[in-house]
Design a protein with these regions (language model features):
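Extreme N-terminal leader/targeting segments of oxidoreductases
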Residues: 1-41, 56-75, 195, 482-506, ...
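Glycine-rich Rossmann-fold phosphate-binding loop(s) that bind the pyrophosphate
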Residues: 45-48, 81, 151
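N-terminal FAD cofactor-binding segment of flavoenzymes
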Residues: 56-60, 71-129
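Predominantly flavin-linked oxidoreductase catalytic cores and closely associated redox partners
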Residues: 59, 69-72, 152, 156-157, ...
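Active-site-proximal substrate-binding core of FAD-dependent oxidoreductases
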Residues: 71-74, 87, 362-368, 380, ...
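FAD-binding beta-loop-beta segment adjacent to the flavin cofactor pocket
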Residues: 335-366, 481-493, 503-515, 522
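C-terminal auxiliary extensions adjacent to catalytic cores
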Residues: 423-474
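Iron-sulfur cluster-binding cysteine motifs and their immediate structural context
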Residues: 509-569
């Protein structure tokens, strides 16, 4: 077993999960030819990127009868592990309208699934647990002309459009393996269903199937199981590591309408560089009677006791926030990791037979808190380049990578390429550097500021937990009651889809316990002192947020249909 770092602090990377992605999750088709499911294009992930791709591809095929016929009975299939498309989608969210306008030019914004245009905005610096000051809205936070949405609702709307256009939606179906033949991706294998917790077939067992396709689109979201395997198998990674943040969100019914979108910086995050606490909050109106509130923090933090879920509960105790929520009722909760590595951490986006789209490709603009329109734009580009190559009988989709970098996605992300990294120097120093970058549109300070894996951050006990409020079940909440309202219905006897080392230092076990918003990891009550801990993994609680992959473990494909059932997140 690897040791802790030389300064005596525990480093999660020193205790890697027992997994070999290429050996386990990449391989040739195994089903006999007569039982294989053959489609034209298989899209993994029923979120904005995958469904934008499906819709655009079907628009193109509607004008090309010859290619549609060549692609077979099912020209476009979408594989989605959630119970429905959108079940695992969560975001703030404010959406730029550019991709919707491009994809559906004949659909009026009033017919989109939104809560209307941003009505106004404010940014506050939270000084303490009782004080705040409004500050001028930084340029990246200006949202005039953008729309407040639920990304879960958007995904369901896009899925309905795609299905009506001819897409075959395979919901409750995980994509467990990337099928590769002669160094070319030829599809995916779906996961088994009906296995017990030890992997044994139960009475309702259904084996997975080979889904063969002329093109495969990996649009799996923030942590892509097959995307990670493809990056390893085809050497698609860059010299910079992807890094993540974790967002935890609640939706509240409130008695008084909120008339503007709000972002905050500062408290309850600590500003000293040693804690490496980077993030902030949002509060968005969802019509007259609901608000979305959430907190996002980088997963490169250093304190063992840091918990984004509990930081959100602490944030809600501020008098200014109570003034918005009190008298209301929490009706939804969820959590999701967010790729924050920016331009330098984007992988190569194409290999023979396959492309990567959306969050799986790290397409998030960190300072602007935007990614949904990038996901959709990348899906549109993927569809157009796949269509062109299939028409030419080619599986070389490398032109897609260049197209993304030449598009609004690549241009925006290059401009903001160094705007996360400076905050490793602390809130005030990092903020000053980023202000210079914003003012010069990324030119100064220029250069290449490297990212470092979240799991390489040494961890220490910094006393974070003493600031968390005790859950009262009405205004502040524990993790398990939160998982309950996420709609999570994972079977108690389902197989474990989480890989972590079981025997780890107590600090690491405690870090996982605090980190996880769903209460998956637990330190046994009888664990002695500071010795190694046999971590309890309550995997049926998992809402598949992806944070464990950033901090030393690894999610694998769950059984299709497991996990949350997000409705308005």
């Amino acid at each position: 077993m690897a040791a802790a770092s030389s300064n005596g602090l525990v480093v999660p990377a020193a205790f890697p999960p027992p997994v070999n992605p290429v050996e386990e999750f990449v391989g040739p088709p195994t089903d006999p030819e007569e039982v294989r499911f053959e489609v034209g294009v298989v899209i993994v992930g029923g979120g904005p990127a995958g469904l934008a791709c499906a819709n655009r591809l079907l628009q193109l095929l509607a004008e090309d009868e010859a290619l549609t016929e060549r692609l077979g009975e099912v020209p476009v299939a979408v594989v989605e592990k959630g119970k429905v498309c959108g079940a695992h989608n969560l975001s703030g969210a404010i959406m730029r309208p550019s991709a919707m306008n491009e994809l559906f030019p004949d659909v009026a914004p009033s017919d989109w699934p939104t809560y209307g245009e941003v009505p106004g905005e404010a940014v506050y610096l939270m000084l303490t647990g009782k004080q705040s000051v409004r500050i001028p809205t930084p340029p990246p936070f200006k949202n005039h002309g953008n729309y407040v949405i639920s990304v879960a609702e958007l995904s369901r709307w896009l899925a309905d459009k795609a299905e009506k256009a001819g897409a075959y939606l395979l919901t409750e179906t995980s994509a467990a393996k990337l099928l590769v033949d002669h160094n070319k991706v030829v599809g995916i294998r779906s996961g088994d269903k009906g296995r017990g917790k030890d992997g044994e077939p139960l009475g309702n067992f259904e084996p997975g199937s080979d889904v063969l396709a002329k093109a495969t689109v990996l649009a799996e979201g923030t942590w892509g199981h097959l995307t990670g395997a493809a990056i390893r198998a085809f050497d698609l990674g860059t010299e910079d590591s992807q890094v993540w943040a974790l967002g935890v969100k609640e939706v509240w019914e409130v008695p008084t309408p909120l008339t503007k979108v709000i972002h905050t910086l500062g408290w309850p995050l600590r500003t000293a560089a040693k804690y490496k606490e980077f993030g902030g909050s949002w509060i968005y109106p969802m019509g007259d009677d609901k608000v979305s509130i959430g907190f996002v923090a980088g997963l490169d933090y250093a304190d063992v006791e840091f918990s984004v879920h509990d930081v959100l509960q602490q944030f809600k105790t501020h008098p200014q926030i109570r003034g918005i929520l009190e008298g209301g009722k929490r009706i939804a909760w969820g959590a999701k990791a967010i790729p924050e590595g920016g331009y330098w951490a984007m992988p190569k986006l194409a290999a023979p037979g396959v492309v990567i789209a959306g969050d799986s490709g790290g397409m998030v603009n960190v300072p602007e808190l935007k990614g949904i329109h990038y996901a959709m734009h990348s899906g549109i580009l993927a569809a157009e380049h796949i269509y062109g190559q299939l028409k030419a009988n080619s599986s070389d989709f490398s032109s897609y990578d260049a197209a993304v970098h030449d598009s609004v996605i690549g241009k925006d992300m290059f401009r903001t390429r160094n705007m996360k990294q400076p905050f490793s120097k602390g809130f005030f120093v990092g903020g000053a550097i980023v202000n210079a970058m914003v003012a010069t549109k990324g030119r100064l300070p220029g250069g290449h500021w490297k990212t470092h894996p979240d799991k390489d951050q040494p961890m220490f006990r910094g006393g974070r937990a003493k600031g968390y409020p005790k859950p009262d079940g009405n205004y502040t909440f524990d993790k398990l009651s939160s998982v309950y309202i996420s709609g999570n219905e994972t079977r108690d006897d389902a197989p474990n889809h989480i890989r972590v080392q079981k025997e780890v230092p107590r600090e690491l076990a405690e870090m996982w316990q605090w980190m996880c918003p769903a209460g998956v990891y637990e330190v046994p009550e009888d664990a002695e002192g500071d010795g190694p801990v046999d971590v309890i993994v309550n995997y049926t609680n998992c809402v598949q947020c992806g944070a464990i992959t950033a901090k030393g473990g690894r999610l694998t494909a769950p059984e299709g249909g497991d996990g949350p059932l997000y409705q308005i997140t």
